[in-house]
Swiss-Prot record:
It is an enzyme of class 1 (oxidoreductase). The keyword DNA damage does not apply. Pfam families: NAD_Gly3P_dh_C, NAD_Gly3P_dh_N. This is Glycerol-3-phosphate dehydrogenase [NAD(P)+]. Keywords: Cytoplasm, Lipid biosynthesis, Lipid metabolism, NAD, NADP, Nucleotide-binding, Oxidoreductase, Phospholipid biosynthesis, Phospholipid metabolism. One of its GO terms (biological process) is carbohydrate metabolic process.
Length: 297
């Protein structure tokens, strides 16, 4: 049995390190890396099990340029919504593989802590429960895995929490205090639930690892790149310069635009996301934050 992680960023590297403990696991990316177990894309695609840790915005392009056998088994470990199409990642994969052949990974998990082998709990979601169990069996003992069938809920929670983490970083950057941050996160959870419910996500998903768990982690720590984006926005830094300095992908930025567009099309009330996007477009963080604090819902 051979596994390949597609994507050699921090998260992909962390997954590779964890999975290679008990299995033959390779890692690959578009560009050559000086990494142990690194293989070409062609060699990676010869593996039966593929784990995708690419940027959500680059996923479709990668899938179009590289042939995936429809019999291959896939775990989607990226978290985001494609900005251009407003499609969830599972919808993108459906253009290339049957839904029975992929699962979605979610849950509170900083790459740095996984690489340190610190205790971590993850959720694997898919309609093929046997495949979920198979992927769960690949992980070492320090990673506890749970399985369910709520693919859409896992996708939405994983994407939405990144935007809420930016909002939380803005709140902390403005030194509004712990009370304000707690209010923002809890109201963000309600907003995320409202959005997800429209698309058929299950209620319990929002209170589990992929929902409240991942939201709390991502919205409260400087280990979160999305949270750090919010901190810098609160210092009146321009988004372009923040992202250039970050030198990593902050999925919440593009995802915020996608959620805003979807919410407008479907008539879903998403005040936090709307204000985050307004800040991206030049609105002052002080004005946007005051608007949120005055909301009655």
């Amino acid at each position: 049995m051979r596994i390949a992680v597609i994507g050699a960023g921090k998260w992909g590297s962390a997954l590779h390190l964890a999975l290679k403990e008990n299995h033959t696991c390779f890692i690959s990316s578009l560009h050559q890396r000086d990494l142990e177990d690194f293989v070409s894309i062609k060699e990676a695609l010869e593996c039966e099990y593929l784990i995708f840790a690419l940027s959500s915005q680059g996923m479709r392009v990668w899938l179009k340029e590289n042939f995936i056998n429809k019999g291959q088994k896939i775990l989607i470990a990226s978290k985001g919504i494609e900005d251009q199409s407003c499609q969830f990642l599972d919808e993108i994969f459906l253009d290339f593989v049957p839904k029975e052949n992929f699962c979605v990974l979610s849950g509170p998990s900083f790459a740095a802590e996984v690489m340190q082998k610190l205790p971590t709990a993850l959720m694997i979601s898919g309609i093929n429960q046997e495949l979920c169990k198979k992927f769960a069996s690949f992980f070492p003992d320090f990673i506890k895995t749970y399985i369910d069938d709520d693919v859409r809920g896992a996708e939405i929670c994983g994407a939405y929490k990144n935007v809420l983490a930016i909002a939380s970083g803005i709140s902390d950057g403005l030194k509004l205090g712990n009370n304000a941050r707690a209010a923002l996160i809890s109201r963000g959870l309600i907003e995320m639930h409202r959005f997800g419910k429209f698309f058929g996500a299950k209620e319990e998903t929002f209170l589990g690892l992929g929902g409240a768990g991942d939201l709390f982690l991502t919205a409260t720590s400087v280990l979160s790149r999305n949270y750090r984006v919010g901190l810098k926005l609160a210092q009146n830094q321009k988004l372009d310069s923040i992202l250039a300095e970050l030198n990593e992908v902050a999925e919440g930025v593009k995802t915020a635009y996608a959620i805003e567009k979807l919410a407008k099309m479907k008539g879903i009330y998403t005040p936090i996301v709307n204000e985050v996007v307004a800040i991206f477009k030049g609105k002052s963080v002080q004005e946007a934050t005051q608007n949120l604090l005055k909301q009655n819902d």
